[in-house]
Amino acid sequence: ALVAFAWSLAVVPTSLPAKAYYEILFWGGGHALQFTWTLLMLVAWLALAQACGGRIPLSPRIVLLLFLVALIGVFGTPLAYLMHEVSTVEHRDMHTWGMRFGGGLAIAPLALAVLLAMAARRVGPALADTQRPLRSALLASMLLFVAGGVIGLAIQGNNVKIPAHYHGCIVGVTLALMG
């Protein structure tokens, strides 16, 4: 992310209006940070589910493979800079596509595995008092992150869906890490 920020700073035309300048300046690095925070959130989801007594129905190898798929978006960041000028729509779309592809392919199966682990957990003994806040953080995180993701899939053009998508996702990440 720091390399992306520095690269943008070096090549963004300073003649752009301030709004466009700063949006372009932080677009690539911001998306690289989003990949990182999303991966940390997924780790937190797995940890929270296990702390609540859930057994994740995926092998460690499959989880690792899903994390590697999610990293595709991060590795695509330098390609966006090498292939397109930073002020082009193609540059911007490449970062967005990376998040949808890399993040989306990993998030869905991991989220489903966590939900299955939590559903199976409901059959066993009741949660201890110390586990209830963990479960609440996990489920609220998943709900908000998925809502933000669904809103993100509906984005077309500049409208209120963009901040709704971003805030849903970032609050989902925050709740997972607070849990």
Which role does the model predict for each range below?
Residues 1-4, 10-13, 31:
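Hydrophobic, small-residue-rich alpha-helical packing segments that form membrane-like cores
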Residues 27-39, 93-109, 167-174:
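Alpha-helical transmembrane segments of polytopic membrane proteins
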Residues 7-24, 39-65, 79-95, 112-139, ...:
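Juxtamembrane membrane-water interface segments of multi-pass membrane proteins
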